Amino acid sequence: RITMGFLFTSESVSEGHPDKVSDQISDAILDEFLRHDPNSKVACETLCTTGLVVVAGEVRSEAYVDVQGVARRVINQIGYTKGDYRFDGNSCGVVSAIHEQSPDINQGVVREAEEEQGAGDQGIMFGYACNETREFMPATLILSHVILKELAVIRREGKVMTYLRPDSKSQVTIEYDEQTNRPLRVHTIVVSTQHDEFILPGNGLTEKEAEQQMQERIREDVRTILIPRVKARLERAGDKLADLITGDYILHVNPTGKFVIGGPHGDTGLTGRKIIVDTYGGRGAHGGGAFSGKDSSKVDRSAAYAARHIAKNLVAAGVADEVLVELSYAIGIAQPLSIYVDTYRSPRPAALAGMTDGEIARRIGKLFDLRPAAIVKRFGLKNPIFEATASYGHFGNRPYRKSVKVWEHGVETEREVEFFGWEKLDAVDDIRREFEL
């Protein structure tokens, strides 16, 4: 009999999506505080709407940050540089309502001995990994991200599809094999992108006809320019995901028709509203806490990064094909209250034949120091590395080192720091030893 596959879908949004504009401003402000004072405590929320950015939050820091300047730089960098967009970096208003962190919170978090620093809040955090892509991420999400990354490259090059504006979304549905849970092929791709009004009514063209011609042109360009470039990009990187995009997928482009009004003028953006795009595209689980604008004393962020690091290293070490890790914390307490592991009954090596998920979790607790200060140290989370995480996902990126400007003792200097350190596979050997693999 023919086995039917099942369908799973993930979405992504571009750096020009209003919620992502907010995330990037929040993280850029966090980075600016950390550049001047690595011990800054920051919780920064941003709202973007027509012609206006509002930044609010709690900060405890020795540093002064030019909030207006940072927000404008981010907005211009994303590409909101024209008055037509009704939101641009040079003319929008920027209101800052940042005030000091509550001493009640501070006393529970800051300790004499740094390694005993308590968690900044209670909460649950999840980390997930699977072996269906070389990033140890769901294929649906990786493809959704890559489509929009390539669209942004095309927009910035300005050679083809010159009508592109910064706001866009993608969605990818993949058919999986019911027996093996492996991805078989891309079933549906949705691309919605903001664009200039590049065909105007007049000269015998009605408004409806002009709109239809624009839509046909954009659809054709996505089919013949964007998707082939996405495939080529994956092939250049030696990525097998390219093989999933065959000729018979369904393509929807700007299904409502015209998409000229967009960005923060079309929809108000808020920090922390794209938490599934930021993580695993609907796979695994999510504790509900957003990442952007929070310094690493907030376990919402640092412990979610640590949980991803554990899950990814467990899968890479061959413990299971798919792993979910949950950590929980209480405010002011350093050690996690619980560690939970779910291997989804996925195949595991003979050496682990009788081992329960509970036993795996107990061993993880022994292998990894999950106190907030230890996590911060392991991944260098006091460095200004967060703006890079605020678009196209916090996970599934390659770790890299780069020189950044920081201030030490009132003097600006360059320091090499690591980005996406939680994606390193540096615990695989320890895990294999522990589990005798």
Please state what every model-predicted region is.
Residues 49, 320-322, 329-437:
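Internal helix-turn-beta structural module
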Residues 3-43, 428, 434:
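N-terminal, positively charged regions that mediate nucleic acid binding
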Residues 11-13, 17-22, 117-134, 259-285, ...:
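Conserved phosphate/anionic-ligand binding catalytic regions in large, soluble enzymes, centered on
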Residues 43, 54, 95, 125, ...:
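Structured core elements
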Residues 24-28, 142, 146, 302-309:
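Short amphipathic alpha-helical face segments that pack within enzyme cores
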Residues 273-275, 280-324, 335-342:
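C-terminal catalytic subdomain
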Residues 9, 69, 76-261, 391, ...:
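Glycine-rich, mobile lid/loop segments that gate access to catalytic sites or pores
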Residues 43-61, 331-335:
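Short, charge-patterned binding micro-sites
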